[in-house]
């Protein structure tokens, strides 16, 4: 009996830990990305996990692609969209409260929530983007602090990341960052390099498929 109780307790502990540290496999025609969802943004993590479990994102498109900036997807209207149709206005009926964290910033590879222009900066319930960005110089970051960040200083450690790995610091503390690509950064570059139309939609569709990753494999 004691052994059984111990095993049940161990299983409960492991399950609880896994519920926090979630990874998602994103498959595309250009390769596969593995995304780690952050514990510091539980509302966004929970919502994203729910949608992945529901297969919400399967067959949706990366409908907005801007080289040296980001790749965006999650519009439910993109699933059966006609070629050339303008996308980006589809939603799933709710928003997620903003979860800004000073140590979660727009370095290359992060997963962040898209949103419309609302005073609370609440996130879309389904649309997201993955940052490609660019490498910045000190002079560019200095200018950005004055012109776009209202004088807010970029922390030294983050500044070094923007100068070496790159990203989109102009978006910091305006859009919720809630995950990070930990494998497959090259896939971002491949998708970002595709040819697009005047609305930044790829001329050739870039569909996605997502699955949760458990310790013992894909779920």
Give the positions of each predicted feature.
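Cyclophilin-like peptidyl-prolyl cis-trans isomerases
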Residues: 17-219
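Sec-dependent N-terminal signal peptides
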Residues: 4-13
């Amino acid at each position: 009996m004691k052994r059984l109780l111990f095993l049940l307790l161990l299983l409960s502990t492991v399950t609880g830990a896994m519920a926090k540290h979630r990874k998602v496999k994103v498959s595309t025609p250009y390769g596969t990305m593995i995304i780690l969802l952050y514990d510091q943004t539980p509302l966004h993590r929970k919502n994203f996990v729910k949608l992945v479990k529901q297969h919400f994102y399967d067959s949706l498109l990366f409908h907005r692609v801007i080289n040296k900036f980001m790749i965006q997807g999650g519009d439910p209207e993109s699933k059966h969209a006609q070629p050339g149709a303008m996308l980006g206005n589809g939603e799933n009926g709710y928003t997620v409260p903003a979860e800004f964290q000073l140590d979660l910033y727009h370095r290359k590879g992060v997963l962040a929530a898209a949103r419309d222009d609302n005073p609370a900066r609440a996130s879309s319930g389904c649309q997201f983007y993955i940052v490609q960005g660019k490498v910045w110089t000190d002079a560019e970051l200095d200018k950005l602090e004055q012109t776009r960040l209202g004088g807010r200083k970029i922390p030294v450690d983050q500044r070094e990341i923007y100068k070496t790995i790159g990203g989109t610091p102009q978006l910091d503390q305006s859009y919720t960052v809630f995950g990070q690509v930990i494998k497959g950064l090259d896939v971002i570059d491949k998708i970002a390099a595709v040819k697009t139309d005047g609305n930044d939609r790829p001329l050739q569709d870039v569909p996605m498929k997502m699955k949760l990753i458990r310790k013992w494999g894909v779920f």
